[in-house]
UniProtKB/Swiss-Prot annotation:
It holds the Pfam family FTHFS. The gene is fhs. GO terms for biological process: tetrahydrofolate interconversion. This is Formate--tetrahydrofolate ligase. InterPro entries: Formate_THF_ligase (IPR000559), Formate_THF_ligase_CS (IPR020628), P-loop_NTPase (IPR027417). It is an enzyme of class 6 (ligase). The keyword RNA-binding does not apply. GO terms for molecular function: ATP binding; formate-tetrahydrofolate ligase activity. Keywords: ATP-binding, Ligase, Nucleotide-binding, One-carbon metabolism. Gene3D superfamilies: Domain 2, N(10)-formyltetrahydrofolate synthetase, Formyltetrahydrofolate synthetase, domain 3, P-loop containing nucleotide triphosphate hydrolases. Belongs to the formate--tetrahydrofolate ligase family. It comes from Streptococcus pneumoniae (strain Taiwan19F-14).
Length: 556
């Protein structure tokens, strides 16, 4: 079979104006970036707000292998299949970060015959949103350092500045840096560091803001650090929220592209799910719900991270809650969670599938806690065997969860028809009754304990001394009624990436709590989660090139 990039380059794209015409979007509603990419105008976004709200399908997954389990591929393929069976469907997914594209992933726009196009543009600079977020973030850093240099009227303690610079790359050498060196003319020396752009609070804000005014309000609420008297300093104190919003005025508008089969797709925003809330923008998802009968969206990593955050953080900002959750499972991930070594995942091992099913079962149970019906999608790989598939179907039947094999990577829309029909049937026969996991009025500790004990199935939460001090500060400042965004490894229910399967009765340690008032949540950091990833021994970048005619090579 052809590579992803070869498949993408073999497709004759339709002008984006033609793709979105069926949604009632005209040329005048678009801000074009060439023939095949566009942003949707705010006038059109506001015009469709009175339209009925369609059905929402959330795609999540079991705890993944390092290569991922094909959530984006399944999301795209399911939407194509829904359109194929006559359901007016849109996609709302995240934009890839260039760091992982150059690092381990090599691309993140779906795969095989379930891709959003033009995949080269989407994986690289796209419409410049990542650049705008990076620039806004670093403009704030420059303004903070300038304030220190110009006399520090606000009394900011440079030892307690929370705000870091960002770059959209995996670059471990930038995790800890010192700025302001070189004498009095070059600023005030202080410790600083870089995060990856998608970890920036501005990325989370962009994905939760509903319009320019809300964007400015959220930007003003960002806590950049503390004064010498330990009181918080915000962007509003610096009076620069207007300037930051100006940099982001186009980035906030959702991007429109198409799939191989011509399904319209919003690709907008891209926070990571292990260090942020892991969902595409509220604006894109909400607008899709007003334009289509079915919207298919995704949340990053496993359901313990992305789906929990989608349901506890993003859903309260949407006009509706998910009508169904599709949990993507692969036999290789089940075998890994069943104790098989990574180099043996392609070998038949029915017993390991049975052992690893405990992981999938827990995710199904967790989704049901939110009052939403679950459907299991087996993302088919060439190494899967009939015996393994039969065992998984039998196990799913034992817990009364619908399950379908999906071959959208190899077969495109046709390979997702059975899944699409099952999802539509599930929505019709099992109406969702959404409820949040916790009430925001609970204490910070109680909310974290609720997530750890009910979703992860841990027995106890330990708070390090630094975290205890920060909780007291959060309560003192009146921030304790915000939801919790857990920063945790994606590979395990616990904070130990090696504890695979369905561990129980473990303890989780909270080492730090970071207020993200602009985004509207408190980040609870566990384990060794990094906000600036590093590159692997052999980065995907080594396989990439561009020919003299501009043809891109090596994205996959």
């Amino acid at each position: 079979m052809k590579t992803d990039i070869e498949i993408a380059q073999s497709i004759e794209l339709k002008p984006i104006v033609d793709v979105v015409e069926k949604l009632g979007i005209s040329y005048d509603d678009l801000e074009l970036y060439g023939k095949y990419k566009a942003k949707l105008s705010f006038d059109k976004i506001r015009a469709v707000e009175s339209n009925p709200v369609g059905k929402l399908i959330l795609v999540t997954a079991i705890n993944p292998t390092p290569a991922g389990e094909g959530k984006s591929t399944l999301t795209i393929g399911l939407a194509d299949a829904l359109n194929k069976i006559g359901k007016k469907t849109m996609i709302a997914i995240r934009e890839p970060s260039l760091g992982p594209v150059m690092g381990i992933k090599g691309g993140a726009a779906g795969g095989g015959y379930a891709q959003v196009l033009p995949m080269e543009d989407i994986n690289l600079h796209f419409t410049g949103d990542m650049h705008a977020i990076t620039t806004a973030n670093n403009a704030l850093s420059a303004l903070i350092d300038n304030h220190l240099h110009q006399g520090n009227e606000l009394g900011i303690d440079q030892r307690r500045i929370l705000w870091k610079r960002v770059v959209d790359l995996n670059d471990r050498a930038l995790r800890h840096v010192t700025v302001g060196l070189g004498g009095p003319l070059n600023g005030i020396p202080r410790e600083d560091g870089f995060d990856i752009t998608v970890a920036s609070e501005i990325m989370a804000i962009l994905c939760l803001a509903t319009d320019i005014e809300d964007l400015k309000r959220r930007l003003a609420n960002i806590v950049i650090g503390y004064r010498y008297d330990r009181t918080p300093v915000s962007v509003g104190d610096l009076q620069v929220e207007g300037a930051l919003a100006l940099i982001l005025k186009d980035a906030i508008k959702p991007n429109l592209v198409q799939t191989i089969y011509g399904t319209p797709a919003f690709v907008h925003g891209g926070p990571f799910a292990n260090i942020a809330h892991g969902c595409n923008s509220v604006l894109a998802t909400t607008t899709a719900l007003h334009l289509a009968d079915y919207t298919v969206t995704e949340a990053g990593f496993g359901a313990d991270l992305g789906a929990e955050k989608f349901l506890d953080i993003k859903t309260p900002n949407l006009p509706t809650s998910p009508d169904a959750v599709v949990i993507v499972a692969t036999l290789r991930a089940l075998k890994m969670n069943g104790g098989v070594a990574k180099d043996a995942l392609t070998e038949e091992n029915v017993e390991a599938v049975r052992a690893g099913f405990a992981n999938l079962k827990r995710h199904v149970e967790n989704i049901r806690k939110f009052g939403i019906p679950a459907v299991v999608a087996i993302n088919e790989f060439v190494s899967d065997t009939e015996a393994e598939i039969a065992a998984l179907k039998e196990l799913c039947a034992s817990i009364d969860v619908p399950v379908e094999l999906a071959s959208v990577w190899a077969d495109g829309a046709e390979g997702g028809v059975a899944l699409a029909e099952t999802v539509v049937k599930t929505i019709a026969e099992n109406p969702a009754n959404y409820k949040r996991l916790y009430d925001n009025d609970l204490s910070v500790q109680e909310k974290i304990e609720k997530i750890v004990t009910e979703i992860y199935r841990g027995s106890k939460v330990n708070f390090e001394k630094k975290a205890q001090t920060q909780i007291a500060q959060i309560v003192q400042n009146g921030w304790d009624k915000l939801p919790i965004c857990m920063a945790k490894t994606q590979y395990s229910f616990s904070d130990n990436p090696n504890a695979l399967g369905a561990p129980e009765n473990f303890e989780i340690t909270i080492r730090e709590l970071v207020p993200k008032l602009g985004a509207g949540f408190i980040v609870a950091l566990t384990g060794d989660v990094m906000t600036m990833p590093g590159l692997p021994k052999r980065p995907a970048a080594l396989n990439m090139d561009v020919e003299s005619d501009g043809t891109v090579l090596g994205l996959f």
